[in-house]
From Swiss-Prot:
Family annotation (Gene3D superfamilies): Cytochrome c oxidase-like, subunit I domain
InterPro entries: Cyt_c_oxase-like_su1_dom, Cyt_c_oxase-like_su1_sf, Cyt_C_Oxase_1
Co-factor binding comment: Binds 2 heme groups. Binds a copper B center.
Species, as recorded: Thermus thermophilus
Similarity-based family: Belongs to the heme-copper respiratory oxidase family.
Pathway note: Energy metabolism; oxidative phosphorylation
Protein's recorded name: Cytochrome c oxidase subunit 1
Length: 108
């Protein structure tokens, strides 16, 4: 695990997205259960689950894809400042989505 490129936003973004997908998938089991869905339907639980799924996995994977794609399309590697900014954006997005989703689940 230490040998993985943790300083590359193109790697970190989808990994964090997958980490957010784990509790989102557990919430999907709740939504799929008729008895539990009856309790959480039309509450803040549902948007909390949606944001864990879409905002964590899909958006972070798109961010990571762009951090890989743009340097390859332009032929210019990203600078150290851009790499650090990319890591900050990815981590802040992930933490913000986790805080928001936990709040929505708690309220639901």
């Amino acid at each position: 695990i230490r040998a993985l490129p943790w300083d590359n936003p193109a790697f970190v973004a989808p990994v964090l997205g997958l980490l957010g997908f784990i509790p989102g998938g557990a919430g999907g089991i709740v939504n799929a259960s008729f008895t539990l869905d009856y309790v959480v339907h039309n509450t803040a639980w549902v948007p909390g689950h949606f944001h864990l799924q879409v905002a964590s996995l899909v958006t972070l994977t798109a961010m990571g894809s762009l951090y890989w794609l743009l340097p390859n399309l332009t032929g210019k590697p990203i600078s150290d400042a851009q790499r650090r900014l990319g890591l900050a954006v990815v981590w802040l997005w992930f933490l913000g989505m986790m805080i928001m989703a936990v709040g929505l689940h708690w309220a639901g």
